[in-house]
């Protein structure tokens, strides 16, 4: 009988739509040998070899004696050089589709056929998604929990048992170098419990150091006993016990002869795994009068000696991870510290196969998170998670129970084929009964938008580039520095901080985007992926210094290293964690839901006298005297608020000063304040002003990310200076200051489990996405959002997420309640003519200059007369416009490049305009010659390729202080002179998206204090609605200068 086949192609509405063939494959009988179109192949590197990557082009289900799946695959980017992968036995159940990337283990036959069956080979689905052994082991009993734990990482709270386990791991690992005698173990335990390393965790869990020490000491005799029984150290020449084996020879004995590594961090793109091996040991195995040495992973467990499938599975997975660094150990060791009993866990094929299948299933659900509707609308919805298990008892103690029920009720129950085990229906109902349909819809929409955004970022960059691209390729993008050798001594800063210095094997350190404070992954150039992670301390021409979590001193001296920027995933876990918290059944979350989702009106008290303490009135009155009228109104509104206030900080209105003054007043009234923003620099700008007024504050965050003048107030520096090692001292520090400052993503700090604030102030609130902005609001009774939704919105890269509303900030959302809004309209930055531009375009005339001095201010050019005299001698008819542009009394100039002409060019790196770049360069040279300081000039362009081109011109000029940057980088800042290059100039009607955003234009127009020069092609820019209005206003004011043909070539030198 002929086998029956069922074809599977990439669905026309799938996520890979743009990468699939323009028309479907025909039936296999008609076109079985045709070369599939390469449009199905995603933009990822494909290759053969040990770390092969194949793209699945076509899937055929074959029903013969046994069901099989035949995958047509290629390792060619062109879609040729086809191979066949046959899935047999239970591998047939693998969920896979055309366009998926796979890795194959096994042997390929001479006819280019792979066979993956019960007995041969492995298939790794999405191998570049590295999944931890813990997640896979937890997925054995409930795959849904593993998926949710990956998504809602910040919701997995620590526990006393987990902390004890971590500390015991630490003690054991230290003992591998110090010894396992009773006295040494006691000393290590004391050092661990009473040292600074775990103080935060003990504070968070409200533990007592003496109690913790007592619990830790219960384990110490077992550690000593294990060393006596199983180590071959000269101090432990006792009888060797047999390890218990989960399978194998009962006469086998095992003894540890050497500890090679602790917490060995391994990434395995070969098996799609990652993990930290507790201990890597050289082991001597005696079997039937024979002895042999092996390097094996040793997994430590502090809980009940269960020898459970989850525990054994982790060890089996570590045997696979170990193959990234050395030969297959074929087995691993599982040690229970409570009893001192150790098991040998063989890494047999059966266990490895089943665990990799679970890993594939987990990777499928973590990758295929979105679903395109089949109704022709191409609407994106959230995909279902693995099914719920029918075990109420297990679910009762699950840390993801709330998220499990929440996702089911808000997402899965909206689909037709949603199934819930009958016994779980009341559980889901109980966990979510406090939520209304509006609440569930808010959660569903924001979960979808955050997922769309995370996926759009992952498609452009990601961790996989570290192993899929060479260091030279990554260097071109500024994301890596390769060919490095380690130099000098490794300095130990703390238990998990080691200062390393690297230099280029030949030549100086290349130009790079890597900067101080950036997170990096250190790998070997040819082997040893992800040896260590850490942060850059300093980048110089001759060397680069890093603080890493591991010492690299034991590695070969001639090993070449590469440092890769570890790009964040966009903070998806923070977004989802805050969304989950908002849905909690708690009074804090309920209040925020009412204000944010239900739009309950904010409440205010009527009289300040009920708020201001009598002894603070004179101080507050003194502070208020230095403010203008709108700023005073803002102070009053905040003090009267019971829920929230929005302060609209229009350009140049002294937003930072206003926040600083607000903190001073709240401080004087005895209120506690949580001060936050999205960026460290925004937080520190406020603190630098506060510092001058002797307002005490505690700054949370990694020291390397903080402004140098703020670092002395950081938790890290204070703990070092005071040598804080007790919980009482730490608690005193955390409660010592009424003002605590951190970023919005720093609120997972332990201090927030014990402290609540009277007010939370969020700066840059109009630029922060709603879920991130939510984070600090959970920890205060009232909040103040400061921003301006007429300036830059939250950055959203996904067009679909933007259309759904992800660029709406919490500031913008709450602005509908106008009684909570105060506008700062008096500005101190721009002269009147520059201010008039945004006043007409955006602010409807509400902006006003603070004084005549501000209104009439012009750029200071001490050498302008000398320069103008020089120009008169060299002047030609073609360059007369230059004098007008230099004239300080002309604050606004638009240089129309239409007649030159100055057409844009589009290359691989992006869009640029070399003529505009040249004009910007020459204009800047003239301003410098006229006496303008380089630091007073700023250059703005919407496209990075244009910035790169302009910067290349400036490399030949000693004017490195002239800042060249995007609009986004200039938000909140100003310069005396701003030159804007609009770049776009074409005849085919191309527009692009960057210049369509009037908020971005508003920021560009409001950065200049005294002189604003814009360059662009009027006919092209007129096609943008917002720019058309600008050009119309400029024409009315006679501020447009038509540059003559070849103007860029007639510059006076």
Swiss-Prot record:
Binds 1 [4Fe-4S] cluster. Residues 522-1053 are annotated as: Helicase activity. InterPro entries: Dna2/JHS1_DEXXQ-box, DNA2/NAM7-like, DNA2/NAM7-like_C, DNA2/NAM7_AAA_11, DNA2_Rift, DNA_replication_fac_Dna2_N, P-loop_NTPase, PDDEXK-like_dom_sf. ATP binds at residues 649-656. It comes from the Eukaryota. SUPFAM superfamilies: P-loop containing nucleoside triphosphate hydrolases. Belongs to the DNA2/NAM7 helicase family. This is DNA replication ATP-dependent helicase/nuclease DNA2.
